């Protein structure tokens, strides 16, 4: 269920100096529902400003939400039956962020109860400059990480995932690998992809899911953080359902 009404008051789109975010309710809770999560984020997330202007607040807000709901923003698991390499978005904390990655992993574990799911974050800077310049070197580094996982864990079902700038990184990684290597990847899932509409290089398009919300300026090649770019947690179950038959 969409939660757009939760953010109505935040859609003015005016740039301003952001204070460090503080949630009104700070008692640590169990893993939230989507609506609970988005309601809390509505208090603290920047909407209507550029990535450059909002970067610090994005990281601070995700740190607050991660602490409130005990959500891990860093994953360095061993390979599982299914292994997810995930590249977080610009300014997201840890190596998988909070807004999208953990929700996707949780949904995938629920969809695959009889399989061990291992998650590895892609260790790249996720900086504003990286986003603006196309995140080329992180793509090369992720390509090497993909080759390492394939070599060390030949029996795992490998899933590549990315959010926002992380989707750029996945695109660039695929461009640095040949088709024979990419054929060993079971699925690719991209959320809020700045390169929406471009194919993932050297890979079967039927195994790619790109989720871009209507009105997401990042998916349109822009650099404004609007409401639709912050709500991809809503699509975690859909993404997991897409991946499930490809790794079963």
Swiss-Prot record:
One of its GO terms (molecular function) is cutinase activity. Optimum pH is 7.5-8. It is found in: Secreted. Its EC number is 3.1.1.74. Disulfide bonds join 79-153, 212-219. It is an enzyme of class 3 (hydrolase). Residues 1-17 form the signal peptide. SMART domains: Cutinase. One of its GO terms (biological process) is carbohydrate catabolic process. The active site is at 164 (nucleophile), 216, 229 (proton donor/acceptor). The record marks 90, 165 as: Transition state stabilizer. Pfam families: Cutinase. Transmembrane segments: none annotated. The keyword Flavoprotein does not apply. The 2 disulfide bonds play a critical role in holding the catalytic residues in juxta-position; reduction of the disulfide bridges results in the complete inactivation of the enzyme. InterPro entries: AB_hydrolase_fold (IPR029058), Cutinase/axe (IPR000675), CUTINASE_1 (IPR043580), CUTINASE_2 (IPR043579), Cutinase_monf (IPR011150). GO terms for cellular component: extracellular region. Catalyzes the hydrolysis of complex carboxylic polyesters found in the cell wall of plants. May degrade cutin, a macromolecule that forms the structure of the plant cuticle. May also degrade suberin, a specialized macromolecule found in the cell wall of various plant tissues. Belongs to the cutinase family. This is Cutinase cut1. It comes from Trichoderma harzianum (Hypocrea lixii). The gene is cut1.
């Amino acid at each position: 269920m969409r939660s757009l009404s939760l953010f109505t008051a935040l859609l003015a789109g005016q740039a301003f100096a952001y204070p460090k975010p503080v949630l009104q309710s700070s008692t640590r809770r169990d893993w939230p529902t989507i609506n609970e999560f988005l309601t809390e984020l509505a208090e603290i997330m920047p909407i209507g400003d550029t990535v450059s202007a909002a970067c610090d607040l994005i990281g601070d807000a995700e740190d607050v939400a991660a602490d409130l709901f005990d959500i891990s923003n860093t994953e360095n698991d061993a390979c599982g039956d299914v292994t997810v390499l995930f590249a977080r978005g610009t300014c997201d904390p840890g190596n998988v962020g909070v807004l999208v990655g953990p929700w996707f992993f949780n949904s995938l574990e629920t969809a695959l109860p009889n399989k061990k799911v291992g998650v590895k974050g892609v260790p790249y800077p996720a900086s504003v400059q990286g986003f603006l310049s196309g995140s080329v070197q992180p793509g090369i580094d992720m390509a090497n990480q993909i080759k390492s996982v394939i070599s060390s864990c030949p029996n795992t079902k490998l899933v590549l995932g990315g959010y926002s700038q992380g989707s750029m990184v996945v695109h660039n990684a695929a461009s640095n690998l040949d088709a024979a290597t990419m054929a060993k990847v079971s699925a690719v899932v991209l959320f809020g992809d700045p390169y929406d509409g471009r194919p993932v290089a050297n890979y079967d398009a039927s195994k790619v899911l790109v989720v871009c919300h209507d009105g997401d300026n990042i998916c349109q090649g822009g650099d404004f953080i609007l409401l639709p770019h912050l709500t991809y947690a809503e699509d975690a179950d859909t993404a997991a359902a897409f991946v499930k038959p490809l790794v079963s």
